[in-house]
Amino acid sequence: MLDAKYIKDNLQQVAEKLATRGYQFDIAEFEAQEQKRRHLQERTQDLQSQRNTISKEIGQKKAKGEDTSDIFAKVNQINEELKIIEKELKDLQDTINQTLLSMPNLPADDVPVGKDENDNVEIRRWGTPREFHPEAPAKDHADIGEILKMIDFKAAAKVTGSRFMVLKNKIAKLHRALSQFMLDLHTEKHGYEELYVPYLVNNDSLYGTGQLPKFAADLFKLEGDFEYSLIPTAEVPITNLVRDEILDTETLPRYYTAHTPCFRSEAGSYGRDTKGMIRQHQFEKVELVHITAADKGEESLELLTSHAEKVLQKLNLPYRVMKLCTGDMSFSAKKTYDLEVWLPSQNTYREISSCSWCGDFQARRMKARHKNPSMKKPELVHTLNGSGLAVGRTLLAIIENYQQEDGSIMVPDALIKYMGGISVIK
């Protein structure tokens, strides 16, 4: 959530920046609401002051044995008016808060202005895409998996529906090996604290990280007495661990990681990536979350991104880093780098990780702060998150980049020990 005071002091600048994110901020409406709010607040304070003065007068009259019935009538009149105005003020404040909750984060100054993914800017590349012989072109991961009888989309469709999969045998083992490899790399080499977190979260958590109220349609919600939803990403439970907390500044930065399933309805993705593992309702990720002080937020994004990149480098998977434009960033992000891995069957790069610096946007929603003895009052932390990596997409990238002409799949060197010595899947 944006700082209301900052908005009031920088209305035109905020409107211009929000416009680059596709959000139309009605300055006149906002100013009218603020003017009305101030009027109601001033009237409330005036009535409360009158009531306090009269209450003292009642006490004085009672001490003298004088009649106070007329004054009590005036107090009752004030109380009735206060009740009406306080409700009106509350309703108006709720409306203003809903407006604030609907606003996306303001982009950092160096974020390119653009409408969609076509306006993203390439920062760097790593690795050289493998060339396939024209007579033996690269096969799609779904075809390879089905030929090996180790990826079964039909069985998943029977059990559940579309956009699910069943992994079998050595490909299931490779999927598990990947998550273990990623966790070990981040905890042993990059200094992350590993967590096991709930896969169900409450609405407060979803508001905290920005999924609600705007993206309710993307969630899988439980029916019944519990207002719980399945997590769309481990960012939600991990980041909300610091909700309503005042952290000791000396404990920052904090680096957290967790391996979880993720569940998304893909409400806006009808007809896209219907074949294969690219876009599933259920998938797994190893999530990375940083909690930092404000002055370390932007540099922490570079560090987090490098940690996600290291996974791809260890697996020798060619990729590129893209700086997202204003129109393609997620709702809560201030600045985002996407890692895109090379997929031979599509002859292009596809997203495998999104690393975002959210500034104090989520922290303001969560009331997540930090303090040390030299600070006059607690300050909002900065939050960052990224995939390190999406396990399913990494799996399909390995299947495609390590496929052999005989239909087998070579296991990357970094994963052989996690595969119990298996170096070829066939």
Swiss-Prot record:
Reactions mediated catalytically: tRNA(Ser) + L-serine + ATP = L-seryl-tRNA(Ser) + AMP + diphosphate + H(+); tRNA(Sec) + L-serine + ATP = L-seryl-tRNA(Sec) + AMP + diphosphate + H(+)
Top-level enzyme category: ligase
Single annotated GO MF: serine-tRNA ligase activity
Binding site for ATP: R264, S265, E266, E351, I352, S353, S354
Record keywords, A-Z: Aminoacyl-tRNA synthetase, ATP-binding, Cytoplasm, Ligase, Nucleotide-binding, Protein biosynthesis
BP GO annotations: selenocysteine biosynthetic process; seryl-tRNA aminoacylation
Compositionally biased region (Polar residues): 46-55
DNA repair as UniProt keyword: no
EC number: 6.1.1.11
Task performed by this protein: Catalyzes the attachment of serine to tRNA(Ser). Is also able to aminoacylate tRNA(Sec) with serine, to form the misacylated tRNA L-seryl-tRNA(Sec), which will be further converted into selenocysteinyl-tRNA(Sec).
Protein name in UniProt: Serine--tRNA ligase
Organism: Francisella tularensis subsp. novicida (strain U112)
